[in-house]
Amino acid sequence: MKAAELRNLTNEELMNLLEEKKRTLMNLRFQNVLGQLTDYSQISKTRKDIARIKTILRERELGVRR
């Protein structure tokens, strides 16, 4: 997801999305270990999505406007 799309979500929606992305990342890592993962870029994309969500939550916490 793009940061602009994430900024339109509420904090509660962002927290739910963050938990979902963390579960997805865990599943991708398990698939990688088991040799079932075919698209390795999904791991890095998911990690970047998690970072974007955390950044937006932190910006809101600090009151930074973008």
UniProtKB/Swiss-Prot annotation:
Organism domain of life: Bacteria
Q: Which GO terms describe its cellular component?
A: cytosolic large ribosomal subunit
Q: Which CDD domains match?
A: Ribosomal_L29_HIP
Q: Which Pfam families match?
A: Ribosomal_L29
Q: Which Gene3D superfamilies is this protein grouped with? A: 1.10.287.310
Keywords assigned by UniProt, alphabetized: Ribonucleoprotein, Ribosomal protein
Q: Which SUPFAM superfamilies match?
A: Ribosomal protein L29 (L29p)
A biological process from GO: translation
| One Gene Ontology term of the molecular function aspect | structural constituent of ribosome
Cross-referenced PANTHER family, in alphabetical order?
Answer: 60S RIBOSOMAL PROTEIN L35/50S RIBOSOMAL PROTEIN L29, LARGE RIBOSOMAL SUBUNIT PROTEIN UL29C
The entry sums up its family as follows: Belongs to the universal ribosomal protein uL29 family.
Name listed for the protein in its UniProt record: Large ribosomal subunit protein uL29
